[in-house]
Swiss-Prot record:
Biased composition (Acidic residues): 597-641
Species per Swiss-Prot/TrEMBL record: Mycosarcoma maydis (Corn smut fungus)
Zinc finger (CCHC-type) boundaries: 270-287
Functional summary from the UniProt entry: Possesses 5'->3' exoribonuclease activity. Required for the processing of nuclear mRNA and rRNA precursors. May promote the termination of transcription by RNA polymerase II. Essential for vegetative cell growth and chromosome segregation.
Molecular function GO labels: 5'-3' RNA exonuclease activity; RNA binding; zinc ion binding
PROSITE patterns associated with the record: ZF_CCHC (PS50158)
Stored InterPro entries: 5_3_exoribonuclease, Xrn1_helical, Xrn1_N, Xrn2/3/4, Znf_CCHC
One biological process term in Gene Ontology: rRNA processing
Residue ranges of the TM segments: none
Subunit and interaction comment: Interacts with RAI1; the interaction is direct, stabilizes RAT1 protein structure and may stimulate its exoribonuclease activity. The interaction also stimulates RAI1 pyrophosphohydrolase activity, probably by recruiting it to mRNA substrates.
Comp. bias (Gly residues): 1196-1215, 1224-1233
Name the record gives this protein: 5'-3' exoribonuclease 2
Coiled-coil region(s): 117-148, 413-439
GO cellular component: nucleus
């Protein structure tokens, strides 16, 4: 499904859903000739993962695509060799899961028309890119020859790569694939003990429907029959992100999604993009010859390691969603199954294969969290759920879209600010790297070679890799390697992440910007000082000059020309889907990390939190822009640069496209400009906009029905390239949405609808003139050149190909005239086929099929057509359906091999049997319910993890940011010590135990000196060494931050939740909610007024909830609603928590805290004026949330004042610090701008 990085985003937000797959390594033994041979695994033994699975479903397109161009070795030269790769990969997957009941292998058949538009766009772009790449290679070869240099035989041949567009139903390749899989299944049944009891269903490309949807159709129909076991354990393999949504939609809890580990590639050793050798990067390449492996370089390189696999556990995801989606005090009963359906539906808005997503919704901008926040807010008013067992409740959808519409202007404005900031950083990096490249170019790297011709662009791209937080690697290196002997680890962190002003304003300082820059920086930090590096570089240049006369070897030329592409593809290039490998400027933390809303009922606070999230995701978004969709339709032409399809536009070496965005969503009037440019109409044309809205709503209804009930219409499609705005959706309840089922295209009709003329080799010759001759009635369907609208995006692959939509009637009329010219085999390939069921002779079904299907030869009333027979579920393990004879099967005969060239021989005395198989009838419509007899899966989330989810952070930070007692779980990875504690120079830590700490009862943990944790929901009795521990046995008081390095304060019950102490000017943590987060008075009068504005300390300590602390006033007043502001004897009004103070020179103060959580009744002695919330003192941070007064930024006795905070009431605008030269900007009513 078209939701880039959704799998990664989910695995980061809900980390327990992912687990590693354990594989059993095959054993080896000496063969007859003495060489080692690999012994087959005995998959009848227990599963090494400690869990047995019943059914395994393979979305085969996710296997076939990568097997046509496997990683780490040359691509197969013939299609038969590709089949062998498919067998090997499939066997590995089956060996991991070891299904005990059913294996289903589904290949994409003819797709619904709604999907064909996307297929058409992908295939046209892939073919065009392949053609232009081939032309580029030919031009480079000609330039090479013009210099009088020789070329290798391979270069002389320079044949075009295999056309991956052949992986489309109806082609000879797909016909060979179907025959090959049937052979392989029969061979496994005959030879593998682990296959003796399982049933295998093959649904090849002749059966209409997308592979994953055919699988889900099978599951839905099975569960509508009483024979279905609701505790069946399912596993589905595939690369599409929508497998997660489809699995949830089945409402079968025991479901896992299997795929390659998308994070594994991040640990892969990097090599130079110029010479292909490890140990250095292109910027420091000396052109040295490759070191020999053995005397004559005869030792083969180590074969690439197999990529690990991971499970995504749907049961655990359901457990997370139960916490995430459960809204307290709903006016109707909470139904998890229906809530999950709503969540799936909201994901469709962010991306799917059938509709363009709304302009305001980008997963990188936090779109899912935005929609979920709106859903939570509107659900009580909706009176029920958005969806109803696969049907959209349009009136309720109106509320969601109206809520989104109210935020669209702000979303576009924030997006532009983020993009401008990233662009500024990118240009800074570019300038820095260009200077370095210029210095390298001054050294003569040889006298012109083909490597230069083919690698020039790669080299330019290599030098543009971004560094940490906009600081170039050189700048960071110079700072880190400075001659200052008083090295401070906190200063090192600042070098890597920018100063704390950047941390506060840009929010990207703690992010690893990219893996290559990180490794380069790490290597260079371990090396020599800058002067010595210059000397080394000078020596290297001299060495190159002395060796310049020697021509590069053929091996090195080929390595430089082709090998590096396998490890570092250009930014715009399609990735191999099984790799999900990053472009060179992507880091290991490359999922957009969106921070959730912070406080229920506080919409403005939610908006502010999203603003922080957008800034947090800056580096992540840059990496994600390079990462294409999770999808099993991956083009085989990895080395192709799609930017070549964008004409008359400047394309940067990193794959971004320079163009003028004339719509300018961030400026007033964008709707008028959008409709004029994208649709060619005026915004005032309400009838047209209404037609677009209706088509889009039809699409949403179509997609939901497709996921839950099956194809609602084979002919429907969205007839526009662009979507409307959320503000355009009005009066949805009045729309009448109806679908006609129709029938699918035939295979050749789909081929002619989605393939370009460049791929006509996969189409029968009879149809070629329709694609190439100028007098063809449908020649306009096959443009060789087409416009790509960047639609506000920056990466080439994100552009929209403006291809003409296929007119179904014109296409079918043109094809009809040429059908008589087809051969007999082509007529067969153009027909629809059947699913095939295989079992072995040890299966309980074998005798049943032999007797009922092949012995009795039942027929229908015409005496010729075979009659369908119902499968006996008692023999099949509960699997139902209908079977009839397979015309090519003769039990006990010879199974002929379709791959004789690969030494795969015929199977004599075949012990397998095959029959044609139909899914069972759908007894009742699919319902979003759990079936009777289900044994609920074991819950795995701990109380702490549940609480973490409730606080809503997708990247290990809780909703308590700036909110005093609220904690944020584990600290960030970059500064983490054991069990989630934050290191010294950061001012907050998670509420977990430290590396040398103890845990109080019910979660009142405190930690070691590295970031001592905060109190939880109660702590043990205070001890003499627990410096600020105020609690009583059984009181439930929150534990305070421990010692000098305080972390969060706890939730006070009747106890006292105390924040961390100063700790020598810079290790203060969050304040603890002073006197109980929600105003509970402490039990000890000696507590004092300290915690009314707890959280002092430099390096970013957050302030606490003020004005709820106990503070003895004049005459011993014990009123817990008011706190002394500066002196215990003086009331000045409701005290807001102050930010961190007393920072070291390199550190900066933090946020101020909140004032009282509610309007208290008047005290005996009312305050003279309300208190303001002040930011940190030194190098002021953000201002706090004021009471009815202004929220001031940090008072700046030293350097700059911080930004103003949120005020309240008519006088409560946020103000900056009172320093003319360093004042931060003020913000009105909570804006952080």
């Amino acid at each position: 499904m078209g939701v880039p990085a959704l799998f990664r985003w989910l695995s980061k937000k809900y980390p327990r859903i992912v687990s590693s797959v354990q594989e059993e390594d095959p054993k080896t033994a000496p063969g007859p000739d003495g060489t080692e041979i690999t012994l087959p695994l005995d998959t009848s033994t227990p599963n090494p993962n400690g869990e047995e699975f019943d059914c395994l479903y393979l979305d085969m397109n996710g296997i076939v695509h990568p097997c046509t161009h496997p990683e780490g070795k040359p691509a197969p030269e013939t299609e038969e060799e590709m089949m062998v790769e498919v067998f090997a990969y499939t066997e590995r997957v089956v060996n991991m899961v070891r299904p005990r009941r059913l294996l289903m292998m589904a290949i994409d058949g003819v797709a619904p028309r709604a999907k064909m538009n996307q297929q058409r766009s992908r295939r046209f772009r892939a073919a065009k890119e392949a053609r232009e790449k081939h032309e580029e290679e030919q031009a480079a070869l000609a330039e090479w020859k013009a210099k009088g240099l020789g070329a290798t035989d391979d270069e002389k041949k320079s044949k075009r790569a295999w056309d991956s567009n052949a992986i489309t139903p109806g082609t000879p390749f797909m016909d060979l694939l179907a025959a090959s899989l049937r052979y392989w299944v029969a061979q496994k049944i005959n030879s593998d003990p682990g296959w003796k009891d399982i049933q295998v269903i093959i649904s090849d490309a002749s059966v209409p429907g997308e592979g994953e949807h055919k699988i889900m159709e099978h599951i839905r129909r099975q569960r509508s029959h009483p024979e279905h076991d609701p505790n069946t354990k399912h596993v589905i393999y595939g690369l599409d992100a929508d497998l997660i949504m489809l699995s949830l939609a089945t409402h079968e809890p025991y479901f896992k999604v299997l795929r390659e580990d998308v994070f594994a590639a991040d640990n892969k050793p990097k090599t130079c993009n110029l010479c292909g050798q490890p140990g250095h990067f292109a910027a420091s390449c000396t052109g040295a010859a490759k070191k020999k492996s053995g005397q004559h370089d005869e030792i083969a390189p180590t074969p690439p390691e197999k990529k690990p696999f991971i499970f995504l556990d749907v049961a655990t995801l359901r457990e997370y969603l139960e916490v995430e989606l459960n809204i307290p005090q709903l006016p109707f009963a909470f139904d998890l199954e229906r809530a999950i359906d709503d969540w799936v539906f909201l994901i469709f808005f962010v991306g799917n294969d059938f509709l363009p997503h709304l302009p305001s919704l980008e997963i990188r901008d936090g779109a899912i969290d935005t929609l979920l926040r709106i859903w939570k807010k509107e659900l009580p008013a909706m009176g029920g759920y958005l969806t109803n067992h696969g049907r959209v409740e349009l009136g309720r959808a109106q509320l969601i879209l109206s809520g989104l519409a109210s935020e669209e202007d702000e979303i576009f404005r924030r997006r532009k600010e983020d993009e401008d900031r990233r662009e500024t950083n990118r240009k800074r990096r570019e300038e820095m790297q260009q200077r370095r490249d210029k210095e390298l170019d001054q050294g003569n790297f040889g006298n012109g070679s083909m490597v230069e011709v083919m690698s020039k662009k790669r080299r330019a791209h290599e030098t543009e890799k971004p560094a940490f937080n906009g600081v170039s690697a050189q700048e960071a290196r110079d700072q880190a390697n400075s001659s200052n002997k008083s090295y401070d680890p906190r200063k090192k962190a600042i070098v890597l992440g920018g100063d704390n002003n950047q941390v506060v304003s840009d929010r990207n300082a703690a992010r690893q910007a990219n893996m290559d820059a990180a490794e380069a920086l790490k290597a260079e930090l371990m090396g020599d000082a800058p002067k010595q590096q210059e000397a080394d570089a000078e020596r290297a240049l001299k060495k190159v000059k002395t060796e310049a006369g020697a021509e590069p070897t053929t091996a090195s030329v080929e390595k430089q020309e082709h090998g590096d592409d396998q490890d570092s593809a250009s930014a715009g290039t399609k990735r191999k889907a099984d790799q999900v490998q990053h472009h060179a400027n992507a880091g290991d933390d490359d999922v957009a990390k969106i921070e959730a809303a912070t406080e229920d009922g506080d919409a403005d606070a939610d908006t502010d939190a999203n603003a922080d999230a957008n800034a947090d995701a800056e580096v992540d978004a840059e990496a994600e822009d390079d990462e294409e969709e999770d999808n099993d339709e991956v083009d085989g032409n990895e080395d192709v640069d799609p930017v070549t399809t964008i004409k008359k536009r400047k394309v940067n070496a990193d794959g971004t496209v320079d163009y003028e965005d004339t719509v300018k969503m961030w400026e007033p009037g964008y709707r008028e400009r959008y409709y004029k440019e994208k649709f060619g109409v005026d915004l005032s044309d309400t009838d047209f906009r209404r037609s677009v809205v209706k088509s889009y709503i039809e699409g949403l209804c179509w997609v939901l029905a497709y996921y839950y009930q099956g194809v609602p219409s084979w002919q429907w499609y969205y007839p526009f390239h662009f979507s409307p705005f959320a503000a355009d959706f009005e009066d949805l309840e009045s729309l009448d949405i109806q679908f006609q089922l129709g029938s699918p295209f035939k295979p050749f009709e789909q081929l002619m609808g989605v393939l370009p003329a460049d791929s006509r080799a996969s189409i029968p010759p009879a149809f070629h003139p329709l694609m190439t001759e100028s007098d063809s009635d449908i020649i306009d369907f096959y443009p060789s050149e087409f416009e790509i609208d960047m639609n506000g995006k920056k990466m080439a692959w994100q552009g929209v190909a403006l291809l003409p939509f296929i007119d179904e009637k014109r296409l079918l009329d043109a094809l009809k005239e040429r059908y008589p010219l087809l051969s007999e085999d082509e007529v067969r390939r153009n027909g629809f086929g059947n699913n095939t069921l295989f079992v072995g002779n040890e299966s309980r079904l074998y005798d049943f099929l032999c007797e009922e299907i092949y012995a009795k030869k039942r027929t229908t009333d015409d005496g010729e057509t075979p009659k369908r027979v119902a499968v006996n579920p008692a023999l099949s393990g509960g699997i139902t359906g209908f079977v009839k004879p397979d015309p090519v099967c003769v039990p006990g005969s010879t199974f002929n091999s379709p791959l004789t060239s690969q030494a795969l021989h015929d199977i004599h005395n075949d012990r397998s049997i095959s029959v044609l198989y139909d899914f069972p009838e759908q007894k009742t419509p699919h319902r979003s319910v759990l079936l009777k007899g289900l044994k609920p899966p074991k819950r795995i989330l701990s109380a702490a993890e549940i609480d973490w989810v409730k606080r809503g952070s997708p990247d290990n930070r809780g909703r308590g940011r700036g909110r005093g007692a609220h904690h944020g779980g584990a600290g960030r990875d970059f500064h983490r010590s054991s069990n989630g504690q934050q290191h010294n120079n950061n001012g907050y830590a998670g509420g977990e135990n430290g590396s040398a700490g103890y845990r109080g009862s019910n979660g009142g943990g405190y930690g070691s000196h590295n970031g001592g944790g905060g109190g939880g929901y109660g702590a043990p009795v205070g001890r003499s060494h627990d410096y600020q521990q105020y609690s009583q046995s059984g009181s439930g008081g929150g534990g305070g931050g421990y010692g000098n390095y305080g972390g969060y304060g706890g939730y006070g019950g009747s106890g006292y939740g105390v924040g961390g102490r100063d700790g020598g000017a810079y290790y203060g943590g969050y304040g603890g909610g002073g006197g109980g987060a929600y105003g509970a008075a402490p039990t000890y009068a000696s507590a004092g007024a300290y915690d009314a504005y707890a959280g002092y300390g430099g390096s970013g300590g957050y302030g606490a909830y003020g004005a709820s602390a106990y503070a003895p006033g004049a005459g011993g007043n014990r009123d817990n609603r008011y706190a002394a502001y500066t002196q215990p004897s003086m009331h000045v009004g409701p005290a807001a928590g102050r930010g961190g103070r007393q920072a070291a020179p390199a550190n900066h103060a933090g946020y101020a805290g909140l004032p009282s959580l509610g309007a208290p009744p008047a005290p005996p002695a009312p305050p003279t004026h309300p208190a303001a919330a002040y930011g940190g003192y030194t190098n002021g941070g953000y201002g706090g949330y004021g009471a009815p007064a202004h929220g001031y930024g940090g008072a700046p006795p030293a350097r700059g004042g911080g930004r103003g905070g949120r005020g309240a009431g008519s006088r409560g605008a946020g103000r900056g610090a009172n320093n003319a030269s360093y004042a931060g900007r003020g913000g009105a009513y909570g804006s952080f701008y």
